[in-house]
């Protein structure tokens, strides 16, 4: 009985000791967690699960302490913490994170030739965290095995714990609170996973996910990352949906669809599917064979040289879009024969190309243009509808006795002659040629998204949920380029059996339906024994470059696209291991030389002295398009280019005492072409109207303007030799590694991208600094360049509008200047295609609010980089921002004249200027001869080429 109090005392002591031990353990855990999280970036690089089985997710963002010469005393501590990148508070943590592979850690020795000043302690080059970007995928950022990555925008992804810098600076209670808040946000769908980055990674100062939750704005997120919540958003319908829309994919689609009609269609489709009224559950198989039939065809290069007694006739269906009319005409010229038939569908958004194709159809009786047009978006159900309607049209043309259906695009080109193709198909006239995926069907279905429901509207493919593959059939698929015989086309078009009817319904709600519909129908039809697993084509797949998810703005999925062929690929066309007759893709604005090589290989060289063989012209604006098709930026600059040409005419052609070569501009530009020579962009060709002051008559002229070289290696050159080129622009094409905005035409509301091209060498980190026209440092960030990186690109999230004028982007290594490039942000003379008003000009041309391109100031870097901000320069910029009319045009033209040169000018018709050359007699004008693309009379052998 006496032991009880002792036992109670021991229990109390044990309880107290246990609480103390738990407290100590908790504190130790928090301390260890704090320090270990500081190096999470390196830990993630050393291992961890990769996203989708590919490369690892992006390392935790980190900053490297850079060796920067110290600022003068006047600059130290100024600029609102600009020199310290946020006013301090990051020093030990940022240094502890260190660098990536090959990236120096801690303090670096000062390099010889560095900027002349003392070392500035604690400065870290900065990439801000206020805006989240998904378009900064640098070179090699896509997993090597892209097929192991989930293609969906919506499927959950796993990622290693990232370092959260704001937590490392808070006490434990605040850390727990922040963690709890982050978890709640992730549960609500605010979290967003970014694809992993490899070489060329931009090194930011803070976690991107943290930036998304604390600073991100809805407009800066990708559409699929916007908050959707747990229930349907407030959506207006003409008629309320017949069910509760609860699926996250459908809710996301409803929140992003722009038109009321599209939202209505999404709701109706989702409900029909939810009620089991949309998709077939079971389909009848009519193929008498078990398994997959695959006929082998013999390939003998010599046997196809002899024309058969009853040669097949081919219906070529050309599905084209864009503005590359000359490339299309060159391809048409190569495939044309009087015995075949050509049915051309032009995307309903490509009116210029449609006008050009109509002119071609008037020249040849065996060429017709579809009287209907669809918007054939990438991956859309409309492409299958286009093929099926084209097949019906062709079968109803009783005067066209064709035997084979072949689909082509303007990016295709033949790699063997028409005679070879006809001889081969005549030998196998009962076969159908389609390329299968070559994988197990379950994997193909998953990667192709066949088990997902899609709907096309508003020129977008919306993912609405999951679905089941119908029972009873084998699903197949592969390439959407094929050769089908007439008998099978008749079956697909006119059959009302269970297979065809239900497959048309199933594939009406399928992503990339043309890549699977014909395969699946053929394999399960009575014609299954006619399938040849070869579509007779070579496609230039480079998944490292082509699988950049570049179509996510069009489809709720991640797809791939083939690359353009280059001259080094020519040997692939000469293989004879299997029958191939066409190749894709070719694009003359990327490389025309390979098209010429192939054309000469098939049909021989043009006669010596033939003009235009190395030139390429592509229209980007035509007067019938209307100026509403132009942006304010392009309209502004096209006008300035025209005035630049008139000044050239006055200075180089005008003689004193007469006005015969002096002009006054009239109206808007009539047309604009891109001009390339030997696969190098040479500038713009502006066709415009002007009044000749000597005779007061209107003349039509064409001006050639060329951009000046703006990339410059530092002088004296640094020891760092990896950088080969740098450029700034918009519309970066990561697949072809070029800017699609040729010439880099930028305005105040554009978001420029900085690109660098690298040679091989050791791993390095470089610093990139963006400077505006009055020497305000707008952005600075580091980029890790691994030894194998070839290109890097990054879009700094600058606050808009950008200040008009000439900007400079400087590249430094160890704070030693390596190179710089410049780009022009043009002030706008038009707003909504009307002359800009004073209040609009002041709003657009005065730079961002408080001169703050980012959350933090970099003012203290100006003296370090020898970039003084001149009060007179700032005052002049302020006056320029308020200018309109002729004063604004004068400011614009002075800027344009500093970045562009008027190379030449010519007259398209009669002119009063006696020394003005005629455009058709020049080598550069869009009116000059172009025999490789010109279509003439049919030759005796039935061909055009």
Swiss-Prot record:
It comes from the Eukaryota. Its EC number is 2.4.2.26. It is found in: Golgi apparatus membrane. Residues 149-158 have a biased composition (Polar residues). One of its GO terms (cellular component) is extracellular space. It is an enzyme of class 2 (transferase). This is Xylosyltransferase 1. The lineage of its organism: Eukaryota, Metazoa, Chordata, Craniata, Vertebrata.
């Amino acid at each position: 009985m006496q032991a009880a109090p002792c036992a109670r005392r021991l229990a109390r002591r044990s309880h107290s000791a246990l609480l103390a031990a738990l407290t100590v353990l908790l504190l130790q855990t928090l301390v260890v967690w704090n320090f270990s999280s500081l190096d999470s970036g390196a830990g993630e690089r050393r291992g961890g699960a990769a996203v989708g089985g590919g490369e690892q997710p992006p390392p935790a963002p980190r900053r490297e302490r850079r060796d920067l010469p110290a600022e003068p005393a006047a600059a130290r501590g100024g600029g609102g913490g600009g020199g310290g990148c946020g006013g301090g508070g990051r020093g030990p943590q940022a240094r502890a994170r260190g660098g990536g592979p090959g990236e120096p850690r801690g303090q670096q020795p000062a390099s010889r030739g560095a900027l002349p000043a003392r070392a500035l302690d604690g400065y870290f080059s900065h990439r801000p965290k206020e805006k989240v970007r998904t378009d900064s995928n640098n070179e090699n950022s896509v997993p090597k095995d892209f097929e192991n990555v989930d293609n969906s925008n919506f499927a959950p992804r796993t990622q290693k714990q990232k370092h959260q810098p704001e937590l490392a600076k808070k006490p434990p209670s605040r850390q727990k609170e922040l963690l709890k808040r982050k978890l709640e946000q992730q549960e609500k769908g605010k979290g967003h996973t970014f694809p992993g980055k490899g070489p060329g990674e931009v090194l930011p100062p803070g976690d991107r996910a943290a930036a998304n939750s604390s600073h991100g704005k809805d407009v800066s997120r990708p559409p699929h990352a916007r908050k959707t919540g747990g229930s349907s958003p407030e959506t207006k319908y003409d008629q309320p949906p017949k069910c509760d829309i609860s699926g996250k994919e459908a809710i996301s689609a409803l929140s992003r669809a722009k038109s009321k009609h599209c939202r209505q269609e999404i709701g109706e489709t989702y409900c029909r599917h939810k009620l089991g009224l949309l998709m077939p559950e079971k389909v009848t198989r009519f193929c008498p064979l078990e398994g997959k039939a695959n006929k082998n065809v013999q390939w003998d290069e010599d046997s196809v040289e002899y024309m058969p007694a009853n040669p097949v006739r081919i219906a070529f269906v050309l599905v084209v879009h864009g503005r590359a009319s000359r490339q299309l005409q060159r391809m048409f010229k190569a495939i044309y024969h009087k015995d075949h038939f050509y049915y051309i569908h032009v995307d309903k958004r490509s009116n210029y190309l449609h006008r050009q194709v109509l002119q071609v159809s008037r020249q040849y009786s065996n060429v017709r243009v579809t009287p209907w047009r669809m918007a054939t978006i990438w991956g859309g159900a409309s492409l299958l509808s286009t093929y099926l309607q084209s097949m019906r049209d062709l079968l109803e043309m009783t005067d066209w006795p064709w035997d084979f259906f072949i689909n082509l695009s303007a990016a295709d080109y033949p790699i063997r002659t028409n005679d070879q193709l006809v001889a081969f198909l005549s030998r196998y006239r009962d076969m159908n040629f389609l390329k299968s995926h070559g994988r197990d069907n379950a994997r193909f279905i998953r990667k192709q998204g066949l088990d997902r429901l899609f709907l096309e509207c508003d020129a977008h493919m919306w993912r609405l949920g999951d679905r089941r593959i119908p029972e009873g059939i084998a699903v197949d698929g592969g390439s959407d380029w094929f050769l089908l015989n007439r008998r099978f086309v008749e079956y697909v078009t006119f059959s009302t059996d269970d297979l065809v009817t239900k497959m048309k319904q199933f594939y009406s709600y399928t992503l990339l339906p043309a890549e699977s519909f014909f395969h699946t129908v053929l394999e399960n039809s009575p014609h299954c024994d006619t399938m040849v697993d070869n579509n007779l084509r070579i496609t230039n797949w480079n998944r490292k470059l082509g699988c950049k998810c570049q179509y996510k703005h069009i489809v709720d999925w991640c797809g791939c696209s083939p690359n353009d062929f280059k001259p080094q690929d020519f040997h692939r066309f000469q293989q004879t291991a299997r029958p191939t007759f066409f190749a894709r893709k070719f694009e003359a604005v990327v490389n025309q030389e390979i098209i010429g090589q192939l054309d000469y290989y098939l049909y021989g060289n043009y006669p010596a002295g033939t003009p235009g063989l190395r030139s390429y012209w592509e229209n980007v604006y035509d007067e019938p398009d209307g100026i509403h098709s132009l942006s304010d930026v392009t309209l502004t600059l096209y006008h300035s280019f025209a005035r630049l040409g008139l000044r050239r005419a006055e200075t180089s052609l005008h003689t004193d005492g007469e006005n015969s070569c002096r002009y006054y501009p009239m109206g808007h530009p009539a047309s604009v072409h891109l001009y390339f020579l030997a696969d190098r962009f040479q500038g713009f060709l502006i066709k415009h109207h002007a009044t000749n002051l000597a005779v007061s008559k209107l003349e039509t002229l064409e001006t050639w303007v060329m951009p000046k070289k703006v990339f410059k290696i530092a002088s004296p050159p640094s020891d760092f030799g990896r950088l080969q080129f740098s450029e700034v622009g918009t519309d970066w094409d990561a697949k072809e590694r070029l800017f699609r905005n040729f010439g880099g035409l930028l305005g105040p509301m554009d978001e420029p991208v900085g690109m660098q091209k690298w040679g091989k060498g050791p791993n390095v980190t470089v610093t990139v600094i963006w400077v505006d026209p009055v020497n305000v440092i707008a952005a600075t960030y580091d980029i890790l360049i691994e030894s194998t990186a070839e290109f890097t690109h990054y879009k700094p999230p600058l606050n808009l509008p950008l200040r008009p004028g000439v900007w400079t982007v400087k590249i430094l290594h160890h704070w030693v200047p390596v190179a710089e490039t410049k780009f022009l942000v043009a002030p706008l003379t038009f707003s909504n295609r009307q002359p800009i008003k004073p209040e609009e000009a002041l709003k657009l041309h005065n730079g961002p609010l408080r001169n703050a391109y980012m959350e933090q100031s970099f003012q203290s870097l100006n003296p370090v980089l020898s970039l003084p901000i001149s009060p007179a320069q700032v005052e002049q910029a302020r006056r320029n921002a308020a200018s309109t009319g002729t004063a604004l045009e004068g400011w614009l033209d002075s800027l344009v004249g500093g970045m562009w040169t008027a190379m030449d000018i010519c007259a398209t018709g009669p002119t009063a200027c006696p020394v003005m050359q005629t455009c058709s007699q020049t080598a550069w004008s869009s009116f000059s001869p172009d025999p490789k693309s010109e279509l003439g009379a049919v030759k005796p052998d039935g061909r055009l080429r």
